[in-house]
Amino acid sequence: MKKLLTGALTLMLTASVSAQTKLWTLQECIDYAMQHNITLQRARLQLQSAKEDVSQSKAALLPSLNASTSHNLGYRPWQDSGITTVTNGTVNTKVDKTSYNGSYGLNASWTVWNGNRNRNQVKLNRLTEEQAELEIQETANSIQEKIAQLYVQILYLKEAVKVNEASLETSRKNEERGREMVEVGKMSKADLAQLSAQRSNDEYNIVSAQAQVENYKLQLKQLLEILGDEAFDVATPDAAMTTNEMALADVPALMSVYEQALATRPEIQSAEMAVKSSDVSIDIAKAGRMPTVSLQASASASTNSLANNDWSDQMKSNFNTGAGVSVSVPIFDQRQTKTNVNKARIQRESNLLALQDQQKQLYQTIENYWLDATTNQQKFRAAMATVESEQQSYDLLQEKFNVGLTNIVELMAGKDNLLVAKQNQLQSKYMTILNLQMLKFYSRPTPSSSL
């Protein structure tokens, strides 16, 4: 998904290279986050854990084999009889107070059938694995949306700083012109003080906007898991025409975006997967009513130091093998199976409601993006005309002010109106750009989880 958000924003990401601070493009921010974001890394670990569960459930279909052995020493201090042997007519009696015995065994078992519980467990774990993959995609999507929102907000505030700087430059010129007029007696010091106050207010607006830029940069750095002491800045567009054209792009149809999102968004697919998992869980619960058939086999041998024959002969003579089959038929389990089946069905209904809720939330999210894109685009069109009109009006006021044909109140009001118009234009432009990109983001296919 990391290329989707940058498709229409590509032209915004060209910037000159700074010798001191790396300028991060949107694509670079997304790529870095996909590798370093801790939440995403934890989601990948959950996928690895789910894969292990699948492997374990598959192995449960196979027989189990165990080897065992035990060795014991015994001591009988008052032993008075032992092993008697006759050698060359001589009777010898050996009394062993210490004895040793050992046993060796192999045991195998295999559950042949248990109502398909084991096979259904494999299915359930595979569905859980797929959900873990979708969780990675969902987490990645959420991170990319946040990155795009912060990135566009930084671009907006950077341009707002430039607008305020231009306003400050105008205020300084007006203040300088006011001083000249005071010197020749064409303006009172009270009017000059108003011009100075307007200049101070513009300086404050610049500081405030710059502080907001730094705040959003910090939020973006934290999202990317970049250390706080590292210099960080984002790439800015070279030309205003680029962002203007992007803000005036066609808004896609609401239902078209929603239908495509229903088919591709990982949160919807995950909710659908949860319903499928519920169906398998019901089958697993029903297996509690079925018999369990198992096969067993064993081989064992034992030795004792007090025996007359040697170890190898004992192993042969004491070697035993056996095999058998066992069948367990549930008759009454204190309603445990019925309870499990009912609870599994209740969980399925809950998952169906969760799916409906996800679909509703998805529609509401897309609807909000669509409405914001449509509304802000209309505002942007109107704001462009307003800025042009206010600029012409202010230029005329400034010309009149320079020759003493208008008062300070009208000049300041005209300047304030122009500043407000430019700020409204900026805000509506970048809000339109952001919401248009979100609509495109939601309407495009989701790639594989190998991010």
Language-model segment annotations:
Residues 21, 68-110, 238-249, 283, ...:
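Small/polar, glycine/serine/threonine/aspartate-rich low-complexity segments that form flexible
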Residues 1-26, 447-451:
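Bacterial Sec-dependent N-terminal signal peptides
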Residues 19-66, 70, 235-276, 447-448:
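Bacterial Sec-pathway N-terminal export signals of envelope proteins
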Residues 182-186, 401-405, 442:
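A short glycine-centered flexible hinge/capping loop motif at secondary-structure junctions
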Residues 52, 142-260, 372, 376, ...:
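Periplasmic alpha-helical coiled-coil/stalk elements that build and connect Gram-negative outer-membrane
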Residues 66, 105-107, 151, 217, ...:
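Membrane-embedded beta-strand positions in outer-membrane beta-barrel channels/transporters
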Residues 41-45, 58-59, 98, 112-140, ...:
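Sec/SRP-type N-terminal targeting helices
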Residues 6, 75, 220, 228, ...:
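Acidic, low-complexity, intrinsically disordered peripheral segments
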